[in-house]
Amino acid sequence: IGVGVGMALYRLLGLEPDVSVVASCCFNSCFRFCSELYNRHLILTMLHAKEGSFLLFDMHDGLFRHVDSPFRNADFSIALANGNIPPLAMREELYFKHNLVKSAMESLANLHASVSLRRFPVEDLLDRQLPVDEETRTICCYVFEESNTALLLERLFAQKDFIQIGKALSKLGKGLRDKIELTCPELDWLSKRSIETPGCYGSSIVYNGAGGYVAMVMEDASFDAY
């Protein structure tokens, strides 16, 4: 809503909207008037969205690029099932998990202050050679795994390998559930139903959005069955 209002005001005043300015205004309004710390890259996603492409963000440099969608003129699609969960219902848990992940990554960064997380020796973490507790190790491993999966998906998109795209999506969802322990009964139920549907090759819970979603890689012919 904030993005829409920001763009509408620019149009109403006859101004040419500068994307970075609109994003900053939306971010500040969310914080000042709603006490919400909204991710700026999500606002940029909405402002830069183009039909037929995905956005791949580089969180290290704050840059992004468009990646052509492999689903154009294909018999597969990414389907979204809306959980219709009241946003307030999960807000507290999402904040708690966000702070938990942030604290874990900061603990890891302090061990190798001179090395960027992008070049972090993940093998040392997996082999338990670093003095961190098990919870921190598990969370950090998932963050690195998620980053690598995003790069893998870019390659799979180029290859139009829908089955492997579905498997990668399921891997992310499984990590959220098992390693971050972020769950929601309603969304878990929708995700489980998708796996049981013939023609669905993978799914993951997506907590961004009004009521939570389940994203699925599915054959178009399987929509009705789901």
Model feature map: region roles:
Residues 1-71, 196-197, 223-226:
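Gly/Ser-rich oxyanion-binding loop with an adjacent helix/lid
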Residues 1-5, 199-215:
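Glycine/serine-rich anion-binding loops at beta->alpha junctions
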Residues 2-6, 38-41, 146, 150, ...:
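Short alpha-helical patches at coil-to-helix transitions and adjacent helical residues
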Residues 50-204, 216-226:
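C-terminal nucleotide
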